């Protein structure tokens, strides 16, 4: 009070039986955090070099320097993981990519698309091109055009 350190005002609180600390107290004091009245959490794990931000509804952000990762999670079981293996998008339900412009997928290695059910591609025109071999295989295979069907090649073998 009045800039006199002999009359300091200290505002704070202590833990007790009613208000227990969020972490078990220990000698090394490596876990620290802030929890608000509405249960918003910010935690620091010094030995593991991890910072976590969490809401009571299940939204969570984890920054992990030791594990070299960043993870976003929500209450709907959706997550985005960035780590040394790459980026993993995991959805509890559907995953939708939308763009007002074009979407381009590029890979320096093989690219796989797998589905447990039907796989459909639709557009005004469809162009598939291979610089070496193009293969189409199925238990039954159907090629159908509402107009004419053109098959061209240096040599064509039918059965």
Regions inferred by a protein language model and the residue ranges of each:
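Long terminal segments
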Residues: 118, 125-159
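Structural signature for extended repeat/solenoid scaffolds and their inter-repeat hinge/linker regions
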Residues: 1-122, 126-129, 135
